[in-house]
Amino acid sequence: MQAFFRKPKKFVTLTSKEQRVDVPVGLMTKCPKCKLIQYTKQLEANLKVCVCGYHHPLTATERFEQLFDAGTITYFDLPAVKADPLDFQDYPEKLKGDQVRTGLEEAIVCGVGQVNGYPLVACVMDARFRMGSMGAAVGAAISEAIRYATKERLPVTIFSASGGARMQEGMVSLMQMAKSSLFLKQHSDAGLLYVSCMTHPTTGGVSASFAMLGDFNIAEPGALIGFAGRRIIEQTIREKLPEDFQTSEFLLQAGQLDDVVSRHDLKTYYTRILMMHSEETNHATI
């Protein structure tokens, strides 16, 4: 009789007869803009551009392979610099962790290759490594690549993707802003071309130095570009900023960019610029 008045259990444990199959890591990718989930291989086949137009981040190697002709790329070795100039606590361990995770030595990869037959020196920042922050190694790599381009009389491009100066290197990091700008000035004085392509995100000391010094300043759609953060600016001026503030489209309308170029059109865009500024074309017009 007591069993009749007992309350039924609210929860019932069900045993699964089959072992759950885990989805492999990296099989699917979710777009942060439209929330679409699609196969990663399908996204990569479309240059990592979602159907909604959102440009997913590229690795440095992917950027080189998308822009340059196959079989023409020669990567530069990183210049030898002290990895931890200020003996910052835990910094060496963080560097090693990023090196293992990304397979990179630092937050930048530099090299030379051909874009539809036109030679070009390129520096590509990779935000996976210390958020693409600029330290002594990054500054030295950019400076040496520009020095090589000046010596060989080649155009140069830099793909920026950075959170700014690397805080663990303090003043040494800030010095790279002036150092890279100086080498770009020498490159410009030699009458050579520099194209700056800003990708998401390009902020801090990078946006205040070499990223904005191009003969052509272009950016990918939807890229965040600016020096200080949105919240800091709003608190300083005590005003609400536009929703599209610090986007590449906003900067284009304000006249701070020459163009916003989709990833699908980037190689064609570079080809036109390099063709116009090649030495052969210049000699033909003299």
Curated annotation (Swiss-Prot):
Zn(2+) binds at C31, C34, C50, C52. It catalyses: N(6)-carboxybiotinyl-L-lysyl-[protein] + acetyl-CoA = N(6)-biotinyl-L-lysyl-[protein] + malonyl-CoA. Its cofactor is Zn(2+). Pathway: Lipid metabolism; malonyl-CoA biosynthesis; malonyl-CoA from acetyl-CoA: step 1/1. Binds 1 zinc ion per subunit. It comes from the Bacteria. The keyword Transferase applies. It is found in: Cytoplasm. Keywords: ATP-binding, Cytoplasm, Fatty acid biosynthesis, Fatty acid metabolism, Lipid biosynthesis, Lipid metabolism, Metal-binding, Nucleotide-binding, Transferase, Zinc, Zinc-finger. It holds the Pfam family Carboxyl_trans. PANTHER family: ACETYL-COENZYME A CARBOXYLASE CARBOXYL TRANSFERASE SUBUNIT BETA, CHLOROPLASTIC (PTHR42995:SF5). NCBIfam families: accD. Acetyl-CoA carboxylase is a heterohexamer composed of biotin carboxyl carrier protein (AccB), biotin carboxylase (AccC) and two subunits each of ACCase subunit alpha (AccA) and ACCase subunit beta (AccD). This is Acetyl-coenzyme A carboxylase carboxyl transferase subunit beta. It comes from Exiguobacterium sibiricum (strain DSM 17290 / CCUG 55495 / CIP 109462 / JCM 13490 / 255-15).
